[in-house]
Structures are given as structure tokens and as C-alpha cells.
């Protein structure tokens, strides 16, 4: 067995977690396949030998048969023509009893039911009925992931029909699965459970296995499972799409008694068919650095104020991002390599190269869609910020809290006074102000921007401090995500820690330098979770790019979803555009992915952003479109 140091270093080299100078210190640079095999083997071994910080209490295990769907326990809502079951425990050793359950909602036509004396129904699948374009065998199964900020998603405990028929009337089966979130927690009986990565996705995978175990009892095609979510929910939807059947998750699934085989012992897949992600907060192995490259380097207030050591590390992070990005070997739709040129020019740090030009083109395309999709005169104003309002199936008390670890609400934008722009030129003039950065051609109704920095410094300003996701104050939701059973919030960004160690003398020359911050990062880099798995490996497990950026000719570590839809509000300060853009580019390079839609929406922020229409209708239309082609 190789050392933890080799594992961490190999992962850093593979994902760009360390600068090139650090990577060159390795005895050998492993291939992607080598790293996956070695780290997966480590997870398997560690989970059997080290459970030092587990908070879970041993319970008498349930059995697959005892949690199987009971066909005599269906409920029927005659008014809305919905069959449903709530409180279905989907694993035999649940750690979080209020979360590791699911509810299933089925169009009435898909079932034949007989009413029981207690008011429930004994029902079987009706294979002949059709709703829309689907039958009970071909219907897509859609699963919401309403976990903003990587919060927990409590399983439905009561029946709330509002909004369900929006999906069911199209012939979909709607499954609402609970899952653990970023924090440790306590069950109603007083026992404690561990949260954080990778338990949320582990729970959702167990729910998918449960659906397949009950294939003959629950309507819907188990080959057409789609997840959808926003923000941290969008991230976990993307993870569900990227990590299908990954060996990394095996020990975690086993620990909760997931139904990984059918009644005959045949393996059950946890892979899904499609993933919808709005503004996914993901790629956390690189997100702090990409944030400083795209946004932080153009800010000069608060922690990025001139003369502070935190500004110095911000600039260093922006500088080092080029090596990270170039290591990914991303290509455009024509197969051209996308890279950043290293160094300073008039537009900023590493603000040139084919990747830079591609991103600038994406921003311009978004602006031009806005100009063509909207009619002038156009009135804009108000707030563009919307938290998840809860997907159908949840009661108000079950929706995830919109709180950061310190107990303060996530920041919201101050509404602006509505203003009417008479023409596109009026709108462009308002954006340009006294320092023009957009050129507009009225004849073609198209515009171009001078630089990414000009855009971000005006419309996509940094709204987070240094360590946008691994905060120096441990105040971000992601600090909780990579905590463990002993400590709730912990540092995890090895790249930031490396910079603090190797630039200590330079940083300490600043008057505001605090060496305790450096020490706290260093001390927490080697923490392990309740299965003995190091933080660095859990970060890799919770980064979809880990599983996507594998050459087509190498052995794959997972089964990717066939269909992807990625939308983002271009003005959000929550994450850099690199997050969604790199996800799209990586997926486009994979031959085993059937289609990827990527949309950036001008004038929208951290929302379920859409060019036109609404998120629910567009998601449903997309699922119908891609399944019609299968």
C-alpha cells in the first residue's frame, strides 16, 4: 500500500491542486487510471481499518426484504389522481433516520389499485396506460436535489401535493429522496450521525439503488433517472451525473446498508441518465483559485485591499491558476487546446491565451442573447437574487435553511430602482458609463467587450473573501462540508496551504499578517473522516471534474450521465464562471456523453437562470426532448 503522502500528491498533480513546481517533486507522475485505482483501493482499505471519529451508533440492521416497497401500502389522492408512498427507508443501516428515506409520487394512470379497509390501496403497475408520451415502463423518474449551500434535504414526512402534477401530468414519476448535508446531526432518538462530504451524494446513490431494487413495484424507467438542483443542489446533481458506479463510494454505501445488489445477488447501478444543474457550486478542488483569477484579482477592498497579506495571496492564487487550468487539457468544440498564458498584461494576471479568449466569447454571446431576446423599451430593476424556494413534495418546515455556518443569512442583493431603457444603445451606454468597455453595433444588434476584467469589475464583483470556499475564518458552507465527525468546520484547500507555507516570509512582512491562519490550514490538511478517508480524497470524490477529465482511451472510474443541462446566472458573485464553463468543456470532450447544454444568462445572478420561460417548464421540456431521442 502506498503512503498517504503519495496519494495526496498524486491527486494534487492529477487535479492541479498543486503548482507545477510542487508537482515536479513527485517521484513519478501517475496516470489518471493509476491514481483512481490507488485512491479507490485506499478508500476500501481505510474504511475497514479506521473508524476513529465515527459518531454513528450501532443499530439492529433492517433487511432488504423489510424495507422493500409494500404494494398494499399505497395512498391515493383522488382529486389530483396521484398514487404515493412516503417514508420509504432506502437503506438497511440508516445513520440519519429523518433523511435516509424517500417519497414516490406516481400518475394515477400508471397504477391499478383496490382500496383497503384502512384507507390505503393495494396497487400494481398498469403497463398499458399512457400519460403524455410515456408508459409506466418508459416514464422518466425525476429527483430534486434542494440542497443549497450543501444543506441537508429532509425526507417528506407528510403529503404536499402542490406542484407535483406539473411533473406527473407530463408522465413523469417524481421521487423525493432525503439526504444528509454539510453538518453533523442528531436523530430524534438522541443518536448522532456524521454529515459532510461524501454523505449527501452517498445517500442519493442509495436512493437510486432502492428504486432499482423495487423496479417491479415502482413505475418509471430506472434507466431514465434525472436529478435536478440549484447551487449546492446543482453541484450534487452534477456529482450524481459524474460518479455513477464509482468504486470510491462503495464503502460509504456499504456502511449504510445500501441495496447494492438485487434479490438474486446481481449488482445494482447507482448511475443516472441525466443531470440538470443551475449555478452549481462545484469543482471545489480549484474553486478558490479560479475565483481569484476571474474576480478577486480585480477587487481592491476588504481582504483584497492594497497593503495586506491577504491581497498578496489573492494575487498569487490568480497567478497559479494558469498552471491549474492548463493541467486540465480542456479543448473547445473544434478540438483546439484551451490554455492561459502566464504573466501580466494590460488586462490582468494571466489574462490572455486561448482559454481567456474563449471565456470572453462566452460572455459576449450571453450579452448578445440578452439583446436579441428582449424587446426595447426594456425595464430592469429589483433584486436578481433568489434562494431555492423548495421543490414539490416538501413542506415549508422541511426546506433547507439559507444560513451560513456563522448563523447569518446568505447575502442578498440590494434591490435597485426600476429603470426603463428605450433602446439597446441606451442600455449599453448605461453599462459603459464614463469608461467604455463595450462596443455596440446597432446594425447587427451585437456587442463586444474589451476584457474579462472590465466585465467582472463592474457586473460580476467578488462577493466573498479570500478563500471564497475555504474561508480563512472557516465561515463558508464548504468548510463544514469537509469537516469530520470530530470537528464541524475545517480547512481543506491544499493549494492555499502550500502558498502560505512557501511564501511565509513574504506574507509575514505585511502588518496585518496572522500566522495562526497559516497554522490552522497546515494542521487540518491531513484530517480523516469516520471511515478513515483523508480530506484530499473526499475532495476528489466530491469534484465531478475528477471523473470527467479522464482521457477517452483510459479506463473510466465511473459511468457518466448521458444528458447534461448546465445553466448559470452570469452576474453572480458566488462562484467564477470557470466552474460551469470547465464542467461543460470537460463533458464535451467525453465520447460517452450524448449531449451537453450550457447556457449563461446575462443580467441574472445566483438563480435558476433561464434565457426565456421558467426553470421548471424548461427542465421538463429538456427531459422530454432527450428521452424522445433514446
Predicted features along the sequence, with ranges:
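Primarily recognizes the serine-hydrolase "nucleophile elbow" in alpha/beta-hydrolase
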Residues: 213-296, 388-390, 395-400, 404-409
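Cap/lid segment of the alpha/beta-hydrolase catalytic domain
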Residues: 144-202, 241-243, 603-606, 614
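C-terminal subdomain of alpha/beta-hydrolase-fold enzymes, centered on the catalytic histidine
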Residues: 189, 379-629
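Short, surface-exposed "cap/lid" segments of acyl-processing enzymes
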Residues: 109-166, 572-582
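Alpha/beta-hydrolase active-site loop
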Residues: 193-217, 617-621
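C-terminal segment of classical bacterial N-terminal signal peptides
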Residues: 16-24
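Active-site-adjacent alpha-helix of alpha/beta-hydrolase-fold enzymes
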Residues: 160-162, 168-169, 291-348, 399, ...
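Catalytic-loop region of hydrolases
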Residues: 27-138
